[in-house]
Amino acid sequence: MGTGDLNLLKSWNPKLVKNRKKVWEKEQRLLEEDEKIRKRQLEIAKEKEEEELLAGRDSTKGRKTGLEWMYQDDPTAKEDYLLGKKKLDTTVIKKAEVMEENQTPLTKINKTTVIPDAIYSKEDPMARFGTKVKRNKVVKKEPVKPLRGKTTNEPRTDNIKPKSDYKKRLQEELDY
């Protein structure tokens, strides 16, 4: 009555063609990845060999890559000076003096000089905002208007009554 293997009806059955195809595709992808890894390892090995050959050749010729300036001085010497372990050499001091002598008048200008607001505001938007705030403060500080012909900048000293006394003041004015 039963007609055979019930496992053929299951989706996970390894004998089914669709499952065999999935397994084969995964194996192919893994093989391709392994091949790419091998190629990259060969490229890296070749690059290392070339660098070793160039390093041996460059030590005799002195080939420059453009980054030598970062490594020219001994960094520990600078640190020793900064930490107070070592004093400045006279050659360093002489170099600084020669540099000062070679400077033009324009380069001798103190770099801590005050930058005019006009130049500074062109570069910095917050400085522009600050100058506008300063201008507004200056505008608000207008002198007090003098009382009937007096020419003083002193604040008014006459008795100004609060608004709550408005009706009383109005009545006083009408009584005149």
Curated annotation (Swiss-Prot):
Q: Which GO terms describe its cellular component?
A: Prp19 complex; U2-type spliceosomal complex
From what superkingdom does this record's organism come? Eukaryota
Record's function text: Involved in pre-mRNA splicing.
Q: Coiled-coil annotation: which residues?
A: 25-58
The subcellular location is: Nucleus
Q: Region labeled Disordered — which residues?
A: 139-176
For this entry, the protein name equals: Pre-mRNA-splicing factor CWC25
* Originating organism: Candida glabrata (strain ATCC 2001 / BCRC 20586 / JCM 3761 / NBRC 0622 / NRRL Y-65 / CBS 138)
Q: Which gene encodes it?
A: CWC25
Q: Which GO terms describe its biological process?
A: mRNA splicing, via spliceosome
Give the family this protein belongs to, as stated in its UniProt record: Belongs to the CWC25 family.
What assembly does the database describe for this protein? Associated with the spliceosome.
> What UniProt keywords apply to this chain's record, in alphabetical order?
Coiled coil, mRNA processing, mRNA splicing, Nucleus, Spliceosome
